[in-house]
């Protein structure tokens, strides 16, 4: 079994080392193609305005000056002599939940793997950001191997990937695994305006107080309850339930 690893935090990220250890409990045929630098928040973007620079790091490990999407394409189209059986993207530092999956480079790595016809999973470790606070990587490292093996035996339809989020707690405090849907989360984004040394303004995006819908069955509720969240995601973003509604409205109107 061949596994391809990528992430959005970069080739030197601790979460990628965790993912390598997870993958090696499943197979010895592990390949890594990860961004040269942090690509967090770039979602499913391609690099089209500059060249992709590929750097061998060590045996079966490569750094690419590009996005997670670029990394998966480079691995499948250039580096590997055959497609991997599984793409794992992560382990991200911080959860990728609810609306956040649309921004996530970690989830995008799994999206691209799915587009390439490969079983793909995104893995993220929840973490409350604070100086000096440890990331509980051991939660993902302990629970992911068995979970991945189980999910590999599931006959998923084409165009479906799996988003895994591990709770921010001690290993022995994990309250189980729950199959979830995407929740709703407001990140409280605002614009932080500053002034440089020449008096010109510049800006940062700032995260504020997060407000979420913690209804039972959602990914954000599962993590709040110290459960591992397993969310199947589809590439087909068509809102099938609304198609007939729009079609009826158009038939009543003047659209040709």
Swiss-Prot record:
Its EC number is 3.1.3.5. GO terms for molecular function: 3'-nucleotidase activity; 5'-nucleotidase activity; exopolyphosphatase activity; metal ion binding; nucleotide binding. Pfam families: SurE (PF01975). It comes from the Bacteria. InterPro entries: SurE, SurE-like_Pase/nucleotidase, SurE-like_sf. Its cofactor is a divalent metal cation. It catalyses: a ribonucleoside 5'-phosphate + H2O = a ribonucleoside + phosphate. A divalent metal cation binds at residues 8-9, 40, 92. Its main location: cytoplasm. Keywords: Cytoplasm, Hydrolase, Metal-binding, Nucleotide-binding. It is an enzyme of class 3 (hydrolase). HAMAP family: SurE (MF_00060). Nucleotidase that shows phosphatase activity on nucleoside 5'-monophosphates. NCBIfam families: PRK00346.1-4, surE. This is 5'-nucleotidase SurE. The gene is surE.
């Amino acid at each position: 079994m061949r596994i391809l690893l990528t992430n959005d935090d970069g080739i030197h990220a601790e979460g990628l080392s965790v993912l390598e250890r997870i993958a090696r409990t499943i197979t010895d045929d592990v390949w890594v193609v990860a961004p040269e630098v942090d690509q967090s928040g770039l979602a499913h973007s391609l690099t089209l305005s500059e060249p992709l620079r590929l750097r061998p790091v060590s045996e079966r490990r490569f750094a690419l000056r590009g996005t997670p999407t670029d990394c998966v394409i480079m691995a499948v189209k250039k580096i590997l002599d055959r497609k991997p059986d599984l793409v794992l993207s992560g382990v991200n530092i911080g959860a990728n939940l609810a609306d956040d999956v649309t921004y996530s480079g970690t989830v995008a790595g799994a999206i691209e793997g799915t587009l390439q016809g490969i079983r793909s999973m995104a893995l993220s470790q929840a973490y409350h950001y604070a100086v000096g606070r440890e990331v509980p990587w051991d939660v993902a490292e302990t629970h992911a191997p068995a979970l991945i093996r189980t999910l590999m035996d599931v006959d998923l339809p084409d165009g479906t990937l799996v988003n895994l989020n591990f709770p921010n707690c001690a290993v022995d405090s994990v309250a189980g695994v729950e199959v979830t849907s995407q929740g709703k989360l407001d990140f409280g984004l605002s614009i932080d305006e500053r002034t440089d040394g020449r008096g010109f303004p510049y800006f940062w995006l700032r995260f504020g107080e997060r407000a979420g819908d913690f209804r039972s069955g959602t990914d954000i509720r599962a993590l709040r309850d110290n459960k591992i969240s397993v969310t199947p995601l589809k590439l087909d973003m068509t809102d099938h339930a609304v198609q007939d509604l729009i079609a009826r409205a158009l038939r009543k109107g003047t659209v040709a």
